[in-house]
Every structure is written in C-alpha cells, then in structure tokens.
Amino acid sequence: MSRKNQAPKREVLPDPLYNSKIVTRLINRVMLDGKRGTAATIVYDAFEAIKEATGTDALEVFETAMENIMPVLEVRARRVGGSNYQVPVEVRPERRTTLGLRWLVNASRARGEHTMKDRLAKEIMDAANNTGASVKKREDTHKMAEANRAFAHFRW
C-alpha cells in the first residue's frame, strides 16, 4: 500500500430530481459498468414505485430506511499478544452511510423480484418497516459487537 498522502474526498453533487447527495450516492452504488443513466432510471423508477405503494414522499421513506440500516457499532480485528480479538468500535458517520448503501444494494440484488427497480423499491420499503435483509445485516453486526463487548478495552 502506498505511504503517500491520502487522496482527498471528492464532493458528490446532489441529484437533479431530489436535490439530495445521498440519492446520488445510491445511484453510484447501483451503477454497473459506468452506466449512470441506467442506474438513475432504476433508482427513480423505484422511488416512483415507493410513492405509489405508500402514498408518501419516496425520499422520506428512503431516509427512514437508511436510518434503520446504518450501523452504530461494528467489530474490527485487533492483534494483541499473538491472538486476534474482534474489538467493537463506533462507526464513523461517513462509513455508516457507505455501509448502509452497500447493504441496501446488495440485499436488493439478492432478492427474487423480476426487475431491479422492484427489488430496490421492496427492499427500501422493508427497511423502512424495520424488516428485510439489509436491516438483518445491521442487527447481526450489532449482535457481534455486543458479543465481543468484553474486548472493548482493546480499542485504539
């Protein structure tokens, strides 16, 4: 790994439809092979489906879902005296969002619905209701952190 300076974080521009940076980041997560237009269509169609299904603003449902997905604690491996310990640590805000989006998109891709927009819409609605695979991933992460609470004093 290079020991040079860390590359500066690039600013993400808000998307044109919802004027939200987190929606832009979702589009970037959904995007495959650089096809941003296709990814944007999938996300916007999913948001339309959410609006039709719930009757409320899709962005509010999405933000509720993200709050339910984003982890507060995670475990990191720490080597102490020849053995590895899973040490629970708090998750930084930027990483919380990144993990939440990653888990949401991965859970959507693993679903059985026919189109990606349907999978994404259903996963967002499930997450907003505190169900679904992405919320389960968060619960598992928190459970691991709780189980390894005894090693919290190894935090760095």
Swiss-Prot record:
GO annotation, biological process: translation
- Pfam name, any one: Ribosomal_S7
CDD domains attached to this UniProt entry = uS7_Bacteria
Q: Provide any one GO MF term from the record.
A: structural constituent of ribosome
Record-annotated disulphide pairs: none
Q: Name one GO cellular component term.
A: small ribosomal subunit
The domain of life for this entry's organism is Bacteria
Q: Does the keyword Ribosomal protein apply?
A: yes
Task: Please give the InterPro entries that the UniProt record associates with this protein.
Answer: Ribosomal_uS7 (IPR000235), Ribosomal_uS7_bac/org-type (IPR005717), Ribosomal_uS7_CS (IPR020606), Ribosomal_uS7_dom (IPR023798), Ribosomal_uS7_dom_sf (IPR036823)
Keywords linked to the UniProt accession: Ribonucleoprotein, Ribosomal protein, RNA-binding, rRNA-binding, tRNA-binding
**How does it associate, per the subunit comment?**
Part of the 30S ribosomal subunit. Contacts proteins S9 and S11.
State its role: One of the primary rRNA binding proteins, it binds directly to 16S rRNA where it nucleates assembly of the head domain of the 30S subunit. Is located at the subunit interface close to the decoding center, probably blocks exit of the E-site tRNA.
Please state which protein family the record places this protein in: Belongs to the universal ribosomal protein uS7 family.
Protein name from the UniProt record:
Small ribosomal subunit protein uS7
